[in-house]
Amino acid sequence: MKRIPILVDKKYSGHWFDQKKAIRFDSNLSGMDWLSDFHEAMYLTKSNTWIWNEFTFGNDGDVDSDKYFKSDENFASKWLTRHRVDIQNYEEVPQTVKDSIEKIVSKMEV
């Protein structure tokens, strides 16, 4: 399944697209909704927007992303998912996570 990352300003809602479905979600951190059979987790970028992609979650709520992502993506996605309610802007993200996010964003076609 082809995943298309969408840049979404955090003031607005966004859509996740595959070849057959469009899923609307709330891009507000504190109001994050889990929809359909897909689970969404977030990335933060320098422009303080969200990039959303599909993840699967284990019973403990941690991201089981090894089969989707390489080391940088795995590290950043796990950290951001665990702290998603606590992070209000990019400045609060630790530098090690920012470095991983930058590598992810640089590889994405948006």
Predicted regions and their residues:
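Polar low-complexity intrinsically disordered regions enriched in Ser/Thr and small residues
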Residues: 17, 34, 61-64
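Short, charged/polar N-terminal "headpieces" of proteins
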Residues: 1-27
